[in-house]
Design a protein with these regions (language model features):
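Short coil turns that delineate tetratricopeptide repeat
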Residues: 7, 41-42, 76, 110, ...
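Register position in tetratricopeptide repeats
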Residues: 22, 57, 91-92, 125, ...
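Canonical positions in the second alpha-helix
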Residues: 36, 70-71, 104-105, 138-139, ...
């Protein structure tokens, strides 16, 4: 099955917007992404997810929430949209809502490390340190040398008053 020319053009526009985002030209990215508001639902979901991310980075939580909810409406399996929505909830101090949203994102995409990481942070915000530690330990199995994950595990052990196991156990070497 051949890819339709309008679909190729839309994909190119998405990539153009992402390039603007990487260059931190958020105004240009927003302008490109807003052009998707009347297009195909799948592409609109991707554009809305990116808009949500941009608005969150700019501190416009109301717009970030609006576009995250729009992206989720157009694509119910969009874990990244849920992560963006959870980020807004977390930033607003709505830790319980954020936990639910990050859990849903992790259920939609079990490989979404952002959902698991942010779920751990939301549990920390709720002072549910055992669940937070469980999230970061799960991440350590996926990303064993990630400094942020190791830091959060050590920080949680400090807060809980328990000694942490060495995240870098001695390894034998031979030539």
């Amino acid at each position: 099955m051949a890819i339709q020319p309008h679909h190729q053009a839309s994909e190119m526009e998405i990539h153009k917007a992402v390039t603007f985002m990487h260059k931190k030209d958020f105004n240009a990215a927003v302008e490109v992404l807003k052009g998707f508001e009347k297009k195909d639902k799948g592409l609109m979901a991707r554009a809305a997810t990116n808009l949500s991310f941009i608005y969150f980075l700019e501190g416009d939580n109301n717009s970030a929430k609006k576009y995250a909810e729009m992206a989720h409406k157009y694509d119910r399996y969009n874990a990244k949209a849920l992560v963006n929505l959870g980020n807004v909830q977390y930033a607003n101090g709505e830790f319980e809502k954020a936990v639910e949203t990050f859990q849903e994102a992790a259920e939609k995409d079990s490989d979404c490390v952002e959902a698991i990481f942010n779920l751990g942070l939301a549990y920390k915000g709720m002072e549910n340190l055992d669940e937070a530690k469980r999230c970061f330990e799960k991440l350590q199995t996926i990303m064993p040398m990630n400094a942020e994950v190791i830091y959060n595990i050590a920080n949680l052990h400090d807060q809980m008053g328990t000694p942490a196991t060495d995240p870098f156990p001695a390894r034998a070497c031979c030539h």
